[in-house]
């Protein structure tokens, strides 16, 4: 995985990450995905880290026919640990296409941003809880990117740069 900063995990202090490429497995990957306190932009960085882990898993899976052909065994071992709205038939179709066509995927990510606040929530209406209040302009930008993909358009790196907050 690629880290945009060097840090030591606060939840798993035995794990340190360098800026740039890091080799992670198991608990170390979890430490990377869950960290927010050691990072300047907290929840926003944690969201980017979670996307980085997902991207790395996809890249690993698509680079190995052995992993792809053992898809059902892998999914069985993960039962109860993950959830998705992606239908199993759609996942199977993607795997079969990857096995027959090969190639690499060009994965793009975009993160909405927000600010931390203490507010009452729907789930905790009588007391304040930490929440991340989304920046509406970044949510609108994400919606536009999703619409492009849904319309069959390709997202370029320039599209992401142009839509990032502050550009």
Specify the residue positions occupied by each region the protein language model found.
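Residue-level signal for protein termini and structural transition zones
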Residues: 1-167
């Amino acid at each position: 995985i690629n880290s945009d900063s060097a840090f030591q995990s606060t939840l798993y202090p035995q794990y340190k990450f360098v800026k740039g490429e890091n080799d992670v497995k198991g608990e170390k990957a979890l430490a990377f995905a869950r960290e927010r306190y050691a990072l300047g932009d907290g929840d926003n960085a944690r969201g980017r880290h979670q996307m980085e882990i997902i991207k790395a898993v996809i890249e690993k899976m698509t680079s190995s026919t052995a992993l792809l052909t053992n898809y059902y065994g892998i999914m069985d071992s993960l039962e109860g640990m993950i959830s998705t709205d992606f239908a199993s038939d759609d996942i199977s179709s993607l795997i079969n296409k990857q096995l027959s066509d090969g190639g690499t995927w060009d994965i793009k990510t975009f993160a909405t941003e927000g600010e931390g606040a203490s507010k009452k929530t729907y789930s905790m209406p009588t007391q304040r809880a930490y929440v991340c209040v989304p920046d509406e302009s970044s949510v609108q930008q994400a919606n536009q990117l999703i619409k492009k993909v849904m319309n069959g358009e390709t997202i370029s790196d320039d599209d992401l740069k142009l839509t990032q907050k502050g550009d």
